[in-house]
């Protein structure tokens, strides 16, 4: 189909169980030369609002090249609409769904290596909304700056983290942390941002999803909830 694997060129493909889509992000950073770059998923794409469960109708709602070009004439970065946690903060949601110590260690690393971002980290952690999924479109020059910052923090966190006791889900640690870090990085940038819908090509049982999140938040009952 013409796809290039992320195990070519300069890569961290072997880290995929822990870094998730970030192995593709790293590959693009190190191997591509282009004006603009973005990240979507095989089942999650930027697009127009669509209410149908029909997969073909969902596919037709996915942004075209023209849609992206029109937005990028007015904005510096395209982002997914924020997820609203409503009843808790970004920090408490992470602590309920994942391991608190990993977020705490990330905060320490930022204070040590990028103290100018500490206030942004605190602000994002105290908010109730978050851009998730690591999805975006921006200029490659801006993307390079983001990746330099992001992977410096994540590689340091990896050095300080023993993953031997982590189950498969929690071993995706660096993917989860990166979603929060992306918002921290954005908080420090003075960018013209555009939030757009995400087209989910799979059918999600939203009532069940909401119930699961409520159980985690209200009763501290663990579920396998991404992000």
Question: For each predicted feature, which ranges?
Answer:
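ER/Golgi luminal nucleotide-sugar-dependent glycosyltransferases, focusing on the catalytic module
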Residues: 1-227
């Amino acid at each position: 189909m013409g796809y290039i694997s992320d195990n070519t060129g300069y890569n961290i493909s072997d880290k995929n169980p822990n870094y998730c889509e970030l192995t593709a992000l790293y590959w693009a950073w190190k191997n591509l030369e282009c004006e603009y770059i973005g990240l979507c998923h095989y089942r999650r794409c930027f697009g127009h609002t669509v209410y149908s469960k029909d997969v073909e109708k969902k596919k037709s709602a996915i942004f075209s090249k023209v849609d992206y070009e029109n937005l990028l004439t007015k904005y510096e970065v395209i982002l997914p609409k924020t997820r609203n946690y409503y009843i808790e903060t970004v920090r408490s949601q992470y602590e309920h769904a994942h391991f608190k110590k990993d977020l705490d260690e990330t905060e320490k690393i930022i204070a040590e290596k990028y103290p100018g971002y500490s206030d942004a980290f605190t602000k994002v952690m105290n908010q109730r909304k978050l851009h998730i999924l690591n999805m975006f479109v921006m200029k490659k020059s801006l993307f390079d700056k983001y990746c330099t910052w992001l992977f410096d923090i994540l590689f340091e966190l990896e050095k300080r983290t023993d993953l031997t006791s982590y189950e498969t889900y929690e071993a995706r640690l660096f993917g989860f942390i990166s979603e929060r870090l992306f918002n921290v990085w954005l908080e420090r940038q003075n960018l013209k941002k555009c939030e757009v819908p995400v087209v989910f090509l799979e059918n999600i049982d939203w009532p069940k999803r909401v119930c699961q999140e409520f159980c985690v938040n209200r009763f501290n009952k663990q579920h396998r909830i991404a992000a």
